[in-house]
Amino acid sequence: MIIGIGNDTEAISRVGQIVARQTKFMDSILTPAEREQALERKGKHFHEFVAGRFSAKEAFSKATGYGIGEKVHWHDIEILNEPNGRPIMQVKNFRYKTYVAITHSGDFVNTVVIIERLTILERLSLKFFPKRGVL
């Protein structure tokens, strides 16, 4: 059952300007693994990546209704890419399933996050087969 949907849009150039001006912005927003993936990218792809992660974390905060900082912090949310490029969101101490979509068009990035309550079968699957995930 879907329990939350969040959406966010950011101007990639604006996030790029923030990264250039505020040296600690990336450290405060991105986890170490996300920073590593970001630094593998060059030019506009670097800014798209950082803006996408920032936007996705904002969308997550909207989907939960918590905001960032109250119950969830920037580093509690990690979005890494699978080998095929699909972003996967993991949230510390969060018992619900999350889905994230990140898309870029021109100077904008748009993200959507969906939060779903797991069925009992899915929860048992995660408990007994944690590396395998949901059946």
UniProtKB/Swiss-Prot annotation:
It is found in: Cytoplasm. Keywords: Cytoplasm, Fatty acid biosynthesis, Fatty acid metabolism, Lipid biosynthesis, Lipid metabolism, Magnesium, Metal-binding, Transferase. Its EC number is 2.7.8.7. Mg(2+) binds at D8, E58. The gene is acpS. SUPFAM superfamilies: 4'-phosphopantetheinyl transferase. It comes from Leuconostoc citreum (strain KM20). GO terms for biological process: fatty acid biosynthetic process. The lineage of its organism: Bacteria, Bacillati, Bacillota, Bacilli, Lactobacillales. This is Holo-[acyl-carrier-protein] synthase.
